[in-house]
Design a protein with these regions (language model features):
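Beta1/beta-strand and adjacent pyrophosphate-binding region of the FAD-binding site
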Residues: 1-12
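Glycine-rich FAD pyrophosphate-binding loop
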Residues: 7, 18-41
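Conserved Rossmann-like nucleotide-cofactor binding loop
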Residues: 12, 35, 149
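Short alpha-helical segment within the catalytic ATP-binding CA
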Residues: 14-15, 47-48
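Hydrophobic/aromatic ligand-binding patch that stacks against planar heteroaromatic rings
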Residues: 15, 19, 142
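Predominantly flavin-linked oxidoreductase catalytic cores and closely associated redox partners
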Residues: 23, 104-199
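A conserved beta-strand/loop capping segment in the N-terminal third of enzymes
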Residues: 49-104, 123
Length: 199
């Protein structure tokens, strides 16, 4: 049986691997970290994904994620408005959600190479060769779900990798009194701060 290699074990890589395994397609996910771990990423998931997640048995209901249906926007000068968020969403940490999907992937039969970073990917004939620091693996199909600004982006000589961004992203979890159904976006000079509840 031919194997699919998925590079990157975030939401896209994990869900792709689960679906492949459920279609009886052998799949290996290569992830540079070990689960569970935090990601610098928004932790608001739109409700447009809920029917799919429920159909696939991947909705994280065991965490009782807060249901978010209000949106607050503030300007640099401090003016703000709050309005209904029609479609809405739910809040869950990537620490929990990714680990939840990782466990689901293992149940489905997905193989994992954790704590392993892909250094190069080359295509010869009809086969991809993936090299890490300590091994080489081959597959006819590779899914790149590794996000942006990775070692592979550098190896593939992608243009955006050469242009450094003047921005930085920071995620911080705090205990505070914030309405569980509200996602807020507060703007300040040169950036913004998003606040929403998680499980």
């Amino acid at each position: 049986m031919k194997r699919v290699i998925v590079i990157g074990g975030g939401l896209a890589g994990l869900i792709a691997s689960i679906r492949l395994a459920r279609w009886n397609i052998a799949c290996t996910v290569v992830e540079k970290k070990k689960y569970p771990f935090h990601r610098v990423c928004g932790e608001y998931i739109s409700n447009e994904t809920v029917p799919f997640l429920q159909k696939e048995g991947l909705y994280p209901e065991t965490f009782d994620p807060p249901q978010i249906n209000r949106f607050q926007l503030s300007s640099v000068n401090g003016n703000s408005t709050t309005l209904p968020l029609d479609l809405g969403g739910f809040g869950i940490s990537r620490y929990q959600f990714d680990h939840f999907l990782y466990e689901k992937a293992k149940e489905a039969g997905v193989d994992f190479l954790l704590d392993t970073e892909v250094e190069t990917v080359d295509f010869t004939g009809d086969t991809f060769e993936i090299k890490t620091s300590n091994r080489s693996i081959a597959a006819p199909i590779v899914i790149g779900a590794f996000g942006k600004r990775s070692r592979l982006d550098h190896y593939l000589d992608r243009e955006f990798f050469k242009r450094r961004s003047p921005y930085v992203g920071v995620k911080y979890h705090v205990h505070t009194h914030h309405p569980s159904n509200l996602i807020a976006l507060h703007n300040f000079r040169g950036g913004y701060c998003g606040i929403s509840n998680i499980e």
